[in-house]
From Swiss-Prot:
Alphabetical keyword list: Kelch repeat, Repeat
Kelch repeat residues: 187-236, 238-285, 287-324
Limits of the F-box domain: 5-51
Keyword Zinc: no
Gene3D superfamilies: Kelch-type beta propeller (2.120.10.80)
Name this protein carries in UniProt: Putative F-box/kelch-repeat protein At4g11750
PANTHER family per record: F-BOX/KELCH-REPEAT PROTEIN SKIP4, GALACTOSE OXIDASE_KELCH REPEAT SUPERFAMILY PROTEIN
SUPFAM superfamilies named among the record's database cross-references: Kelch motif
């Protein structure tokens, strides 16, 4: 039996907003369950302006999932329990409903304090399509890769403060082949990939300040390759990887051949990230690694013996740079339980460079954040600043 709602004296919105601005964004999904008024306040842009003035902006994690091939992708965000009790009472009041749909059997390595909860979106209606995304500030920018079997020039972004969807001007030219997107110096680069890309229309970039598109010159025939499989923003430059490796230098507006400062092999963007100008990656060895640009080789990230064993299948893993740390997220089947379910694990790892060739990781937390049907697909994992 649910407890009756508690009658609180009326508190002016201005005072509530100033109080809420001092609370971590991780607790906002819980606070939004208090009442319609609280739900409106935690989604108001005024609250985030106060947070900005107070210097209380923070990074937040978002996860994009598809529950079946026909369904629309759904967004989840990381939430933290308002209690450190090892046995929280799920019948204890207004916050219980946030956890009941996603409860799971607790394992030894999980503190069970963090979980992913659905994002309440007011106008986020997207027909089934493959999505690619990039983040900048409080926004997640989304490109529709396929629409009715064709590539699309439609560009959208989700404002993660109010969780509303907005449209930005379309690209000047629609890409003919699969593409990648990267953000560099306040501009979003859309890069055509795969075999034999159209070099006359290889890259367009969107200026977030002026809200306009502009063409980026292509690499010359002497240095460009026949296919592009990956891209990376590193040290203020845009790198393209394929049968040849080239780098675009925006300040000089020119292309060069990549030297030995970059790894010879490159991994997909979803299992690689850059933190404090160091490249981190996850590969077939099933461990986290970092690239030493001075030695020009990959080294193991040390100190992670307590991290649960990660999947052999790299498509079940996501890697993300997050406030000077690395966050790793992965899928794992429910052992000895329901064969139709799987768990989403997430770990936040602090980094410490102890010497020129040694970086240690420290696990700050590691939790099962969600339990899902096995048919659910892991799409995107992103971090925004709000």
């Amino acid at each position: 039996m649910m407890n009756p709602p508690v009658d609180l004296p009326y508190i002016p919105d201005d005072l509530l907003l100033n109080c809420l601005a001092r609370v971590s964004r991780l607790y906002y999904p819980i606070l939004s369950l208090v009442s319609k008024r609280f739900r409106s306040l935690v989604a108001s842009l005024e609250l985030y302006e106060i947070r900005k003035l107070l210097g209380h902006r923070e990074k937040c994690l978002y996860l994009n999932l598809r529950f079946s091939s026909e369904s629309e992708p759904r967004w989840f965000t990381l939430c933290r329990r308002p209690t450190r009790s090892p046995n929280p009472n799920f019948n204890s009041g207004w916050f219980a409903s946030c956890f009941i749909p996603h409860t799971m059997k607790k394992e030894k390595k999980s503190s069970d304090n963090n979980l992913m909860v659905p994002v309440p979106t007011s106008n986020f209606i997207t027909p089934p399509s493959e999505l690619t995304r990039i983040t900048n500030g409080s926004n997640i920018y989304i490109v529709r890769v396929f629409t009715n079997g064709a590539f699309s020039s439609r560009f959208l972004f989700m404002d993660c403060r109010s969780h509303t969807l907005h449209e930005v001007p379309r690209m000047d030219k629609t890409k003919k082949k699969p593409f990648m997107i990267r953000v560099l110096d306040g501009k979003i680069y859309v890069i055509e990939g795969c075999k034999n890309p159209d070099y006359s229309n290889l890259i367009e970039r969107f200026d977030l300040k002026t809200q306009t598109w502009e063409h980026v010159p292509s690499p010359s025939a002497e240095i460009r390759g026949s296919y592009i499989t990956g891209s990376l923003v590193y040290d203020g430059k845009l790198y393209l990887f394929g049968d040849k490796r080239v780098v675009y230098k925006p300040k000089e507006n020119k292309w060069d051949v990549v030297g030995l400062e970059m790894p010879l092999r490159w991994t997909p963007s979803y299992i690689s990230c850059v933190v404090d100008n160091v490249i981190y990656s996850y590969g077939r060895s099933r461990v986290l690694m970092w690239y030493n640009t001075e030695e020009r080789l990959w080294r193991y990230l040390k100190g992670l013996k307590k991290l649960p064993k990660l999947p052999k299948d790299c498509t079940c893993v996501r890697l993300l740079g997050y406030s000077g740390k690395v966050v790793v997220l992965w899928e794992k089947n429910v052992g000895g339980g329901d064969p139709q379910k799987k768990m989403i694990w997430c770990a936040e790892i602090a980094l410490e460079r102890r010497s020129a060739n040694k970086i240690y990781g420290k696990i700050e937390w590691c939790d099962v954040v969600l339990t899902l049907p096995r048919s659910c697909s892991l799409l995107n994992f992103a971090a925004v600043t709000v």
